[in-house]
Amino acid sequence: AYEMPTVTGVQTCALPIFVTCMFFGAISGSGPATVAAIGALTIPAMTERGYDKYFAAALVAAAGCVGVMIPPSNPFVVYGISAQVSIGDLFMSGIVPGIMTGLVLMGYCYCYARKRGWSGAARKRTAATLGQAAWDAKWALMVPVIVLGGIYGGIMTPTEAAAIAAFYGMIVGLFLYREMGVRRFCAACVESCETSSIIIVLMAMATLFGNIMTIEDVPGTIARGILGLTTSKIIVLLLINVLLLIVGTFMEALAAIVILTPILLPVVTGVGVTPLHFGVIIVVNLAIGFITPPVGVNLFVASGVARARLERISGMALPMIALMLLVLLICTYLPQVPLCIVGHH
């Protein structure tokens, strides 16, 4: 991201940052982690080139939301388990919304930079230098190729792809890059166990929670209550979108999916929405929640990384949130858009 290309004299800061966040977020599955890791590198680089610090922080916070939509994504995995939907189909359904969100945000950031006259001091880039940079990163770039190629090619399941990618990353870190010693390897194993244990406990409690609600017929009662008020698909989806946006601002995405999926799924299926389509809706909603004031987690992380006031960053993020909401509405009311790769609605 330090080597930012220029287009018509305007430094296209959004392009490398959004693409980097898409890859990093897809691998990590965490919006806040993406903001922390990428923001620490890109925010200082942008401010050195004359960009406003608050705009740079808001841009990275928004870019961190995009990675959650790009497969392989933890929220899609958790939803697939909760709703008994094919995780592979969910991954494919997340590609179009993620790319659409990234493109509209790139366009906005480019226009904003051009309006402000932020041309920066980009270095001259040639095909040779870009090729050399790609060659230097070839081992790291193979990770998403293994994961996505293995899953979409039908060679392996998401679980098998994750295991192979983890083993590949260990080999590369230990023997090729030689940046991971025994101590760092052990620390990475401990951190991985901590992260995995959280998800395992969460899913165990989710199963118990879902069984209790099923026995008590809570989802059916809520579905009958909402559908008793209105049977309009447009109104029901609008109300659910508002609910998910509110929940996404203060609740961790995986927990929200586990709790809300068994409650809302009977409602949306009652108005003709498929579980696959609803998976896209809920994940895109919760991704937007990461950057929605006043308690969007990505905003807090970006504020800490940039050492900037939260309210100023939130103000800069509002136009980006509006564009993300536009993508959400398209994905909600035009299911053929996010599901075009899957091939069924």
Segment roles from a protein language model:
Residues 10-345:
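Alpha-helical transmembrane segments of multi-pass membrane transport proteins
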